[in-house]
């Protein structure tokens, strides 16, 4: 007889509880129903005071079990005498069970009684092993389920001998009789005895209880239970028939050879409640009915087909979809509604800008996540309103009449499309045509619209080679010019209000970005960006980081480097194209030529020079004038009260230092880092004349570290030679304002001890000696007589005998150390290079990690006396 799933429960153990695969709350309900039925059965048979609560307590002594086994044996022998022919076809018990009637719960006698009953069930009744239990399953409550199933099977078999059976066994016989009538099967041989008369099941309440339990599922398509007849239902999409009966307060389901509650059965078989495929019927499946579906159509354009999104509600409802924020993966750009935020490239743009943007918007499409580009460290996650990609490669027309493929750039809000820029020049300066007034008016109108919106959030940070920029310079000779250059720059609006209008244009990157090279852009309150009507030839624009006191990197037009920069920009454009092709896996990178390499070196030198000048400005800026707001790009640029520096300031000094040559490197000796007395002069270590190489090393170490060191007040000082010593050491003092004791101070030892507390936090010893070598605690030998069978015990020497013995002369090295220590303490006050000072330094180097609170320094007058009281040698020590 197979029983419902659940398995043998493991006993409770210490540690984390073992969770079931299906932790249903109803897994113990059918056991409770069975215990109620068995308790009522035993109460009717033997008149016991037993119910489901004390069911196991009554049975744990084994007396009731052995008594019932003997009753069944007597009934079997009587049945054998009455009908020997029928008795030969079924197993019959021949021998009863011996029992100890004085057994108490938990004793060995009780265990013997239970064990005798188990052996009788196996040998005499032939109950299957899968339904049997062990002694501890009942005594220690390790497996209550098998105890119940074994008693139920015993009642089922004993009913054939005429012994009264539990109610569940009677319900089983009614169901089997109903099945035999429907299928016209012959009666079993031997025929079972007539069941006792009992009150029939009330089927009028059964259907209501079934519908109530099934209605717990809230799915649109509930787990189907179709009523076939009274107490018979067809469940799910299969042809499975189940028989349902009411047992007191429980709705029981006949499953296989056992019983289960309807609630637990639904938990295991309802797809809404159990998602495990192992518990769903795999055979006799008919075609499933079409589930309830919701069809949603999203129209992306008048000329596009309507994509259909189907939501299946067959098992569990999906999470709700917010259609206000839903965006399909191939939705195009639409004109913004008044309620939605308008893109930055569309707000405030004039008629000319709309004319220029029309062909661009036709070839641009929005998507949630660009599939061709992986986000970099500086990128922010794109949103449906801000991210846009260009799918495919639409050819764009240049001013020279050529058609070239434009690589798909990512254009966040606030950036001008690349198609506006490449129409001015072809391949970075090959087209010398002047910009037409229509194009200038379009860009002017767009720039006005972008800058007239007032303050806006900071743009996303990007690398230097990731985008290009447009610059409208401040100076008169540069007005009206339309520039392109190799580094990202900003548009300076000619207004007294401090601010920048940033119109970057993105091209594929050529080299990894330089750290700290992204410039934060800020929009002014009402800046005016004007473009002159007189076109002038293209000129190069380079970066001068030191020319800005506002922290905004201004751009200086250099006339003399015009031809070289144009060539560099053309070569950089080629390298960008090659870099993108390399990323797409089509071409291999070409080696750099001599001119190109020299041009890259020149650009790197200019960048490094500008960064070092900016660092000088940052270190010269007082800390109180810095703004507390750090831009998103992570580059913190101080603003010096909104004024330009006067000529001849720190920049000229920095240029002079760079022109003098490389500085001499100072070798730092970590062993000689010791505090110097305040009485001696302390000239500060000043760096020598710096060069580009030295400044570059300082820059690689990090400008933030330099700024933080200067802010904390940490100083590097050079210690003069003391007492004829040639070695000089540089010490790092975390608190230079703290007073340092002079060598003439009588309490110099205590002062040194106090000072060494701060010094040890800055000094890491090479090795940490053993605490027993430092003699900080008495040396205690373990007893050796704990195993007398291995070696004879030794009686420790009494302490009195040690002190009454002949006084031994201390070793010579100890006396010499005491004398040198006493003389050295006096000589150190006169001469700094005495032997005592060397001895103290040697001790400090020998014991660098000794904690001060564990080894206090003795007074100078008592130092020799303390040395004589050193720990005794091993042969003179006492045993504990």
Curated annotation (Swiss-Prot):
Residues 301-315, 725-734 have a biased composition (Polar residues). Residues 201-273 form the GAR domain. Residues 32-159 form the Calponin-homology (CH) domain. SMART domains: CH, GAS2. It comes from the Eukaryota. Residues 757-767, 774-785 have a biased composition (Basic residues). Belongs to the GAS2 family. This is GAS2-like protein 2. It comes from Homo sapiens. The lineage of its organism: Eukaryota, Metazoa, Chordata, Craniata, Vertebrata.
């Amino acid at each position: 007889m197979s029983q419902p799933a659940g398995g043998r429960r493991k006993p409770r153990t210490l540690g984390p509880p073992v969770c079931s695969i299906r932790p249903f709350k109803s897994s113990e309900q059918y056991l409770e129903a069975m215990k109620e039925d068995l308790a009522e059965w035993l109460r009717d048979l033997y008149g016991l005071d037993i119910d489901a609560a004390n069911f196991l307590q009554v049975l744990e002594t084994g007396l009731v079990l052995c008594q019932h086994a003997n009753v069944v044996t007597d009934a079997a022998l009587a049945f054998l005498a009455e009908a020997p022919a029928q008795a030969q076809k079924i197993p019959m018990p021949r021998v009863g069970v011996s029992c100890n009637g004085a057994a108490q719960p938990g004793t060995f006698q009780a265990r013997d009684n239970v064990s005798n009953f188990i052996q009788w069930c196996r040998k005499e009744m032939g109950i299957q092993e899968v339904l049997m239990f062990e002694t501890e399953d009942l005594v220690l409550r390790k497996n209550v389920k098998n105890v119940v199933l074994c008693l139920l099977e015993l009642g089922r078999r004993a009913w054939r001998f005429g012994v009264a059976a539990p109610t569940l066994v009677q319900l089983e016989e009614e169901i089997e009789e109903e099945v035999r009538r429907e299928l016209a099967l012959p009666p079993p041989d031997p025929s079972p005895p007539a069941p006792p008369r009992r009150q029939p099941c009330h089927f009028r309440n059964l259907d209501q209880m079934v519908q109530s339990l099934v209605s717990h599922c809230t799915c649109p398509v509930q787990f189907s239970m179709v009523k076939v007849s009274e107490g018979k239902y067809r469940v799910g999409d299969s042809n499975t028939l189940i028989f349902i009966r009411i047992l007191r307060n429980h709705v029981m389901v006949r499953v296989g050879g056992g019983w289960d509650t309807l609630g637990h059965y639904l938990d295991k078989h309802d797809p809404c409640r159990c998602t495990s495929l192992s518990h769903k019927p795999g055979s006799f499946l008919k075609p499933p009915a079409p589930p309830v579906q919701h069809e949603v159509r999203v129209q992306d354009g008048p000329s596009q087909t309507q994509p259909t999104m189907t939501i299946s509600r067959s098992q569990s409802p999906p999470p709700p979809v917010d259609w206000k924020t839903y965006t399909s993966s191939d939705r195009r750009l639409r004109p913004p509604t008044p309620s939605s935020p308008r893109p930055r490239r569309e707000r405030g743009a004039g008629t000319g800008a709309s004319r220029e943007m029309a062909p661009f918007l036709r070839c641009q499409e929005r998507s949630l996540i660009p599939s061709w580009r992986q986000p970099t460290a500086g990128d922010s996650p794109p949103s449906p309103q801000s991210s846009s990609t260009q799918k495919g490669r639409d050819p764009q027309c240049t001013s020279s009449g050529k058609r070239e493929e434009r690589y798909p750039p990512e254009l966040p809000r606030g950036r001008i499309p690349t198609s506006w820029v490449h129409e001015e020049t072809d391949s970075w300066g090959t087209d010398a045509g002047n910009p037409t007034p229509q194009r200038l008016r379009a860009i002017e109108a767009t720039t006005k619209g972008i800058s007239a919106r007032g303050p806006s959030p900071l743009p996303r940070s990007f690398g230097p080679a990731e985008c290009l920029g447009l610059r409208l310079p401040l100076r008169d000779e540069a007005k009206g010019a339309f520039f392109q250059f190799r580094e990202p720059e900003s548009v300076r609006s000619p207004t007294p209000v401090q601010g920048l209008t940033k119109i970057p244009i993105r091209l594929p990157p050529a080299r990894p970005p330089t750290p700290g090279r992204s410039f934060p852009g800020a929009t002014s309150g009402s800046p005016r960006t004007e473009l002159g009507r007189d076109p002038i030839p293209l000129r190069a624009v380079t970066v001068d980081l030191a020319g800005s006191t506002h922290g905004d990197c201004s751009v200086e037009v250099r006339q003399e480097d015009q031809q070289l920069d144009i060539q560099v920009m053309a070569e950089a454009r080629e390298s960008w194209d090659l870099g993108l092709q390399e990323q797409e896996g089509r071409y291999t990178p070409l080696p750099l030529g001599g001119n190109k390499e020299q041009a890259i070196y020149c650009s790197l030198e200019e960048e490094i020079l500008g960064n070092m000048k900016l660092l000088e400005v940052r270190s010269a800026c007082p800390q109180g004038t810095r703004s507390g707001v750090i831009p998103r790009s992570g580059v913190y640029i101080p603003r010096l009260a909104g004024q330009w520096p006067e000529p001849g300031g720190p920049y000229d000094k920095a240029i002079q230092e760079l022109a003098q040559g490389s500085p001499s490197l100072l070798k730092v000796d970590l062993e000689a880092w010791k505090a110097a007395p305040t009485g001696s002069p302390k000239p500060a270590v000043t760096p020598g004349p710096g060069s580009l190489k030295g400044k570059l090393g300082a820059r690689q170490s990090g400008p933030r570290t330099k700024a933080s060191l200067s802010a904390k007040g940490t100083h590097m000082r050079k210690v003069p030679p003391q007492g004829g010593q040639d070695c000089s050491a540089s010490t790092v003092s975390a608190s230079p304002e703290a007073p340092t004791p002079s060598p003439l101070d009588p309490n110099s030892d205590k002062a040194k001890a106090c000072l060494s507390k701060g010094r040890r936090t800055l000094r890491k010893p090479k090795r940490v000696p053993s605490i027993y070598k430092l003699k900080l605690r008495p040396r205690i030998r373990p007893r050796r007589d704990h195993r007398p069978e291995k070696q004879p015990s030794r009686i420790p020497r009494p302490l009195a005998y040690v002190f009454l013995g002949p006084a031994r002369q201390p070793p010579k090295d100890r006396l010499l150390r005491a004398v040198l220590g006493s003389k050295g303490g006096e000589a150190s006050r006169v001469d700094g290079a005495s032997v005592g000072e060397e001895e103290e330094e040697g001790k400090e180097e020998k014991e660098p990690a000794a904690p001060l609170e564990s080894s206090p320094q003795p007074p100078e007058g008592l130092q020799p006396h303390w040395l004589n009281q050193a720990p005794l040698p091993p042969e003179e020590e006492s045993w504990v």
